[in-house]
């Protein structure tokens, strides 16, 4: 992948174990967002391989990408909610696309909203929610399909310390039930006390892989 005529990522090699939780850090423009987009198939690499469950997903045909994305939940800093749809409708979108039945959609959307503490806001529009609540809607949408992997791109970037801590605890809860979690963040204070691996990107190169203190 290229940014401004140069490679956004160069020689990046790492392995994330199934069921692992890890953090991805680096300065603005280091390549964090690009790496997450490559993993979930939003962007394609110009060279190299990306293996998911033993399969090279960088060579998937366009029609195969949706099947990959059903196994990966993606959370964005600006959460990409549809402001003219209810909270319930926003969370239901991945299930509707996947062709789930009405009963299955109702059950799983309710479970996802309950998990993030927003079941009572299901009929609200996103504009009626706080920034932290909107981010939790984005998280519910990402996990409603029960993905094997959860990717989060600066999910606490616009939130205060208390809300950020709550979001991180949510990710830890998902991880405890077996979901693999990779969270990109520049908030080193938030993650420094967590016992998870920290992968650091700088100028498109990866460093570290150490465990937080």
What is each model feature region?
Residues 144-148:
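A short, proline-enriched helix->beta-strand linker immediately N-terminal to the Walker B motif
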Residues 40:
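Helix-to-loop junction immediately C-terminal to a conserved catalytic motif
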Residues 150-153:
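Catalytic Walker B motif of ABC-type/P-loop ATPase nucleotide-binding domains
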Residues 48-56:
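Conserved ABC transporter NBD signature motif
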Residues 85-92:
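Short coil-to-helix segment of the ABC ATPase nucleotide-binding domain corresponding to the Q-loop/switch region
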Residues 25-27:
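The feature captures the beta-strand-to-loop junction immediately N-terminal to the Walker
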């Amino acid at each position: 992948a290229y940014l401004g005529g140069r490679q956004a990522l160069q020689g990046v090699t790492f392995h994330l174990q199934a069921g692992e939780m890890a953090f991805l850090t680096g300065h603005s423009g280091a390549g964090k967002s690009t790496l997450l987009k490559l993993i979930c198939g939003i962007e394609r690499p110009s060279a190299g391989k990306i293996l998911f469950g033993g399969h090279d997903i960088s060579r998937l045909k366009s029609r195969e990408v949706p099947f990959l994305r059903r196994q990966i939940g993606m959370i964005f800093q600006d959460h990409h909610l549809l402001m003219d749809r209810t909270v319930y409708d926003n969370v239901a979108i991945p299930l509707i696309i996947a062709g789930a039945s009405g009963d299955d959609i109702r059950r799983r959307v309710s479970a996802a909203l309950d998990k993030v503490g927003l079941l009572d806001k299901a009929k609200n529009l996103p504009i009626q929610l706080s920034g932290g609540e909107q981010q939790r809607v984005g998280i519910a949408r990402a996990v409603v399909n029960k993905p094997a992997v959860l990717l989060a791109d600066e999910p606490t970037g616009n939130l205060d310390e208390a809300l950020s801590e709550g979001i991180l605890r949510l990710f830890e809860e998902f991880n405890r039930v077996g979901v693999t979690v990779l969270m990109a963040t520049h908030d080193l204070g938030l993650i420094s006390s967590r016992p998870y691996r920290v992968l650091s990107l700088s100028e498109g190169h990866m460093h570290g892989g150490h465990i937080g203190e």
